[in-house]
């Protein structure tokens, strides 16, 4: 088979699991529960479901439709919809590229912690051990410090796994890997949930997780948080889903696929919250630490609070720690391979390269950039760049995509394409949810955050460093335009 022939999924199940794998990431495990807890508890599920129905599913259908209609990755797909729009697809791909350059390092933290846990068990002081022994964090942004060689080697190992999966192609790589990773990941989370539910104090933690505060529904920030969580959780704006849908066969129910992927992703997040809060409830019960002092998100939860909680388990504490970090590694890798595939497929389409050559080119760039985040100041760099990459680049990429596909090409044309293939028919309402409601909300999210940064700065960093982080936005625009102007290099 010539490498110019487009690959395809061997089954719809493979496509579903790969799409779910792209959506389920580290944030589903360590961020969603905290979002629920801090935004009205069970009441948060109301704006969350509204966001899923009004933005999440409509935009996922849009990305599936673009990919399936054009049979191209994001840059050439948007160019096919409207001449001169290739750069908007590259903008999405570059956004994902920037995020992956440090996301893989976070996966490396999880992998390294997993190895340490298997060999040595839990550290006596998880906070000091993680920040000073593992990350070897420096005093600030100005102090780059040394390289954490354990993290560097782990980062290269993660890149090796990603390369191994993607080099095998769609059917034998992405599809087979996700058919193993996603069911196993679900199994690991169910183990953590079942264990959490048997612990004393667990119900108190779960009550904190789900008890509704309906007054939160009158706070617009809660609604914006719900829409932001849905948008980022479903891997929208990366160009991933466009690329994945381009590998679907001609007859594919795009609407059912979008609904299935969205519900599985959200269901996984909700389930993981029981594991997190049930275990934290137990820690509060045994140690006397108030639950509101124990609850945290992101890095603090994953590498400090949760290991401390698991170390207190009456039995098999190390085993459940291994299960937790193994789940993080699987969730991270399933997302990482999807974002890298968005870049690889775009290069294959644009430059007519073989998969292995395109993958080699992409990995070479990543291996040059990622080590920056393994230095002593790496966590600070990651924090600043992530704020602007995930908070600005992705929403802007999605807004550009919506303008091209819905308003310049025609939402009705894509709706007709979807309806020919799907049992659930889309009405005109879909065009307005995807084409009007979604960009308004995404613009509001970007505008409000920009207002906060302009008035209060970000994270206590000096203005110089915040501006430096924000420069990735114009940089992404410039590189996108350059890539559009580059010519195909056949047979390189």
Swiss-Prot record:
Lipid bilayer topology:
Multi-pass membrane protein
Q: Main localisation, per the record?
A: membrane
Q: Which UniProt keywords apply?
A: Cell membrane, Membrane, Symport, Transmembrane, Transmembrane helix, Transport
Taxonomic superkingdom: Archaea
Which residues span the membrane?
A: 13-33, 42-62, 97-117, 150-170, 180-200, 222-242, 258-278, 320-340, 359-379, 391-411, 428-448, 463-483
Origin organism is: Methanocaldococcus jannaschii (strain ATCC 43067 / DSM 2661 / JAL-1 / JCM 10045 / NBRC 100440) (Methanococcus jannaschii)
This protein's name: Uncharacterized sodium-dependent transporter MJ1319
Its annotated compartments are: Cell membrane
**The family this protein is said to belong to:** Belongs to the sodium:neurotransmitter symporter (SNF) (TC 2.A.22) family.
Q: Which GO terms describe its cellular component?
A: plasma membrane
Q: What does this protein do?
A: Putative sodium-dependent transporter.
Q: Example GO molecular function term? A: symporter activity
Has UniProt tagged this entry with the keyword Cell membrane? yes
Q: Which InterPro entries does the record cross-reference, listed alphabetically? A: Na/ntran_symport, SNS_sf
A Pfam match: SNF
Q: Name one GO biological process term.
A: sodium ion transmembrane transport
């Amino acid at each position: 088979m010539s490498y110019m022939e487009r690959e395809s999924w061997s089954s719809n199940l493979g496509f579903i699991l790969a799409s779910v794998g792209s959506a389920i990431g580290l944030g589903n495990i360590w961020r969603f529960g905290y979002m629920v807890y801090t935004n009205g508890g069970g009441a948060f599920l109301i704006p969350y479901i509204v966001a899923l129905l009004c933005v999440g599913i409509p935009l996922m259908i849009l990305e599936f439709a673009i990919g399936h209609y054009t049979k191209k990755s994001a840059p050439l797909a948007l160019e096919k919809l409207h001449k001169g729009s290739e750069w908007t697809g590259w903008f999405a791909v570059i956004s994902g590229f920037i995020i992956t350059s440090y996301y893989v390092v976070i996966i490396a933290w999880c992998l390294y912690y997993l190895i340490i846990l298997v060999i040595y068990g839990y550290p006596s002081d998880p906070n000091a051990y993680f920040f000073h022994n593992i990350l070897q964090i420096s005093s600030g942004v100005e102090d780059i410090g040394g390289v954490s060689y354990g993290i560097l080697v782990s980062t290269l190992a993660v890149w090796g796994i990603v390369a191994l999966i993607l080099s095998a192609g769609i059917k034998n790589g992405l599809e087979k890997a996700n058919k193993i990773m996603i069911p196993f990941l679900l199994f690991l989370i169910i183990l953590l949930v079942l264990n959490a539910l048997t612990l004393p104090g667990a119900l108190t933690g779960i009550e904190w997780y789900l008890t509704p505060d309906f007054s939160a529904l009158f706070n617009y920030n809660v609604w914006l948080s719900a829409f932001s969580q849905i948008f980022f959780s479903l891997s929208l704006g990366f160009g991933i889903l466009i690329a994945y849908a381009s590998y679907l066969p001609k007859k594919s129910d795009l609407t059912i696929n979008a609904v299935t992927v969205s519900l599985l992703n959200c269901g996984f997040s909700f389930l993981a919250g029981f594991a997190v809060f049930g275990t934290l409830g137990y820690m509060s019960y045994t140690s006397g630490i108030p639950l509101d002092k124990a609850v945290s998100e992101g890095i603090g939860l994953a590498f400090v609070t949760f290991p401390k909680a698991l170390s207190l388990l009456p039995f098999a504490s190390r085993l459940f720690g291994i299960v937790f970090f193994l789940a993080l590694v699987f969730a991270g890798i399933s997302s990482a391979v999807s974002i890298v595939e968005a870049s690889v497929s775009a290069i294959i389409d644009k430059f007519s390269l073989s998969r292995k050559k395109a993958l080699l080119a992409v990995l070479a760039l990543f291996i040059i950039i990622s080590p920056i985040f393994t230095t002593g100041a790496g966590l600070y760099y990651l924090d600043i760049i992530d704020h602007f990459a995930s908070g600005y680049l992705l929403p802007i990429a999605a807004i550009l995509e919506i303008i091209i596909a819905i308003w310049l090409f025609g939402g009705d044309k894509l709706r007709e394409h979807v309806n020919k293939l799907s049992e659930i028919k889309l009405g005109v309402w879909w065009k307005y949810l995807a084409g009007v409601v979604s960009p308004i909300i995404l613009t509001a999210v970007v505008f409000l955050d920009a207002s906060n940064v302009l008035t209060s700065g970000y994270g206590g960093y000096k203005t110089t460093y915040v501006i430096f982080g924000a420069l990735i936005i114009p940089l992404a625009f410039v590189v996108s335009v350059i890539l559009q102007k580059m010519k195909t290099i056949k047979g390189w």
